[in-house]
Amino acid sequence: VADLAAPQPRAPRRWLLLAAALLVPLALVSLLVGAGPLPLGSLLSDPQALQVLAVSRIPRTAAVLLTGAAMAVAGVIMQLLVRNKFVEPGTTGTSEAAMLGLLAVTLMAPGAPILVKMLAAAGAALAGTGVFMLLARRIPPHQVLLIPLSGLVYGGLLMAVATFIAIEGGLLQYLGVWMSGEFSGILAGRYELLWLAGGLALLSYFAADQFTIAGLGRDVSLNLGLRYGQVLGFGIVTVSLVSSLVIVTVGMLPFIGLVVPNLVSRLMGDNLRESLPVVAAAGAGLLLVCDILGRVLRYPYEIPAGTVFGIFGAAVFLYLLLGRRAGG
């Protein structure tokens, strides 16, 4: 038995090393692909090529990696807190609430600093997530599919309110930009808030065991001595902050927090401390693939990364829902 059990601890490390090994060539491709050619040879002799790399390509690649990792981690946290594998910030009204808060502050204080806009979006996301948590508690636990469907309806209601406000305030174009989820406008000096999202994802790793226990439910958590309310609050604040930071910087990116944790869970199981680094790396890698595809499919034009991932994510979401329904 000991011989059979010995290889098990290495499995998570292998998946993490594989994910990291794939990220390196993907990041290199991302640095070289864009509206203008950037040959490797020119980087040593052409100052303009170096400037493009430093001002545009490196910030964009970093923004994609940080966003993918943070949104994937936010998704797995939300799934544990709600105890449902079919939820993420985009299916619980969190993203829509953040967008509503961003729209409100843009309407009332158009010249507000980006940090103020982020805080307004975070406050709205926090309130929106809290409302969803209250709604989810009223749904019987065995109604697994009803929770994400209710979240989609709730998010749709928030989006309808945001659209109405945008039309009345003449901000419909802004709303369209925030919904697109694209990285073409990322430059040095315009993405640095995403490092905070990455920091929150890293901080969540140190609370992985607490999140795992919280995923067992309130009563079990309290019996095990967990401060359930504090863990729940930390998780909701983390998810809300990550969602608002991403929306303020690049716009809405649906399904990352739903698809990635489910795919990793099928490969590694549900040990969050072991799987969370792989979830972050997989989220970063998948979003980077979608961003690269968006740049090359209609070159020299771009398809937003959110659109590309939305197609992939929607297909996986339907597969998971239908698979769950077929399995009873």
Regions found by a protein language model. Give the residues of each.
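Alpha-helical transmembrane segments in inner-membrane proteins
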Residues: 2-328
